[in-house]
UniProtKB/Swiss-Prot annotation:
<comment type="subunit">
    <text>Heptamer of 7 subunits arranged in a ring. Interacts with the chaperonin GroEL.</text>
</comment>
<comment type="function">
    <text>Together with the chaperonin GroEL, plays an essential role in assisting protein folding. The GroEL-GroES system forms a nano-cage that allows encapsulation of the non-native substrate proteins and provides a physical environment optimized to promote and accelerate protein folding. GroES binds to the apical surface of the GroEL ring, thereby capping the opening of the GroEL channel.</text>
</comment>
<dbReference type="InterPro" id="IPR011032">
    <property type="entry name" value="GroES-like_sf"/>
</dbReference>
<keyword id="KW-0963">Cytoplasm</keyword>
<protein>
    <recommendedName>
        <fullName>Co-chaperonin GroES</fullName>
    </recommendedName>
</protein>
<dbReference type="GO" id="GO:0005737">
    <property type="term" value="C:cytoplasm"/>
</dbReference>
<keyword id="KW-0143">Chaperone</keyword>
<dbReference type="Pfam" id="PF00166">
    <property type="entry name" value="Cpn10"/>
</dbReference>
<dbReference type="GO" id="GO:0051085">
    <property type="term" value="P:chaperone cofactor-dependent protein refolding"/>
</dbReference>
<comment type="similarity">
    <text>Belongs to the GroES chaperonin family.</text>
</comment>
<dbReference type="GO" id="GO:0046872">
    <property type="term" value="F:metal ion binding"/>
</dbReference>
<dbReference type="GO" id="GO:0051082">
    <property type="term" value="F:unfolded protein binding"/>
</dbReference>
<dbReference type="InterPro" id="IPR018369">
    <property type="entry name" value="Chaprnonin_Cpn10_CS"/>
</dbReference>
<dbReference type="InterPro" id="IPR020818">
    <property type="entry name" value="Chaperonin_GroES"/>
</dbReference>
<dbReference type="GO" id="GO:0005524">
    <property type="term" value="F:ATP binding"/>
</dbReference>
<dbReference type="GO" id="GO:0044183">
    <property type="term" value="F:protein folding chaperone"/>
</dbReference>
<dbReference type="InterPro" id="IPR037124">
    <property type="entry name" value="Chaperonin_GroES_sf"/>
</dbReference>
Length: 97
């Protein structure tokens, strides 16, 4: 199945980051929080401005991002894999390596 996001929506695959306590112990299960990092799988056509123009999104497919997982973030299954659908405004940063 293929999902194509609309407007300023972005589809992200969460990337798991190893969680460690302050003392260096690796946390697992319920002690570890879900990562707020991911990889952009698809982007919409852009944000529609008040004057009707479409502004292209700053993120692109393949970008590694840090996002805010809050209200408005939708979780879906895509080919058996969990993906997130969110607005570009929920993306806090692009990670450059």
């Amino acid at each position: 199945m293929k999902i194509r996001p609309l407007h300023d929506r972005v589809i992200i695959k969460r990337t798991e980051v190893e969680a460690k306590s302050a003392g260096g112990i690796v946390l697992t299960g319920s002690a570890a929080q879900k990562s707020t990092r991911g990889e952009v799988l698809a982007v919409g056509t852009g944000r529609i401005l008040d004057n009707g123009e479409v502004k292209a999104l700053a993120v692109k497919v393949g970008d590694k991002v840090i996002f805010n997982e809050g209200y408005g973030v939708k979780t879906e299954k895509l080919d058996g894999q969990e993906v997130l659908i969110l607005s570009e405004t929920d993306i806090l940063a692009i990670v450059e390596e």
